[in-house]
A protein has these predicted regions:
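C-terminal substrate-binding subdomain of Rossmann-fold SDR/epimerase-dehydratase oxidoreductases
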Residues: 28-29, 33-155
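Short, hinge-like loop/turn segments at secondary-structure boundaries
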Residues: 16-18, 109
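Anionic-ligand binding region
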Residues: 21
């Protein structure tokens, strides 16, 4: 079970916590936080790909068990502060509309020998560097899964 994915990818998702907050900070100079005390587990896209590769390559070792793949359980406010430390942006706290909060324990996967290499801080840095190379990142509904599903009339 993967955590909330973050980081730069060929199809950049801007509806995921770290990516969205970094995008808003960079382009809008505001980080919009609903509540902030909710916890989200995170995984960099490169680590997710490595974990899938690792699980497939060592499939006999895992015997069809379920493994969590997420390594940084952070409050939304912690993520916002990490971003604010890198971008001059104001944190705007709104009433908490999304009260979901969850953690992941990936110790079983770590005990098997898998080691993540990328952090939320790394994801923030690479997103900032990517946005710096673009005068205005031209996002479309393809960058937001729910909007894309509506566009394709998928329920």
């Amino acid at each position: 079970r993967p955590a909330t994915v973050c980081g730069l990818s060929e199809r950049l998702r801007l509806d995921l916590t770290v990516n969205k907050l970094t995008y808003d900070a960079f382009y809008k100079k505001k980080i919009f936080v609903d509540g902030g005390s909710q916890i989200r587990p995170n995984i960099h896209i490169k680590d997710l790909i490595s974990a899938i590769d690792y699980l497939v390559f060592h499939k006999k070792k895992f015997n069809h068990n379920i493994y969590n793949v997420g390594f940084e359980n952070l409050m939304i406010s912690e993520i916002a502060n990490k971003i604010q430390n890198k971008i001059d942006a104001k944190i705007v706290v709104n009433k908490n509309r999304d009260i979901r909060s969850y953690r992941q324990d990936s110790s079983r996967l770590l005990k098997s020998g898998f080691k993540p290499k990328y952090s939320v801080d790394f994801a923030i840095d690479e997103l900032i560097n990517f946005f710096k190379t673009k005068s205005k990142f031209n996002f479309t509904n393809k960058n937001f899964n729910l909007l894309r599903m509506k566009e394709l009339n998928i329920r």
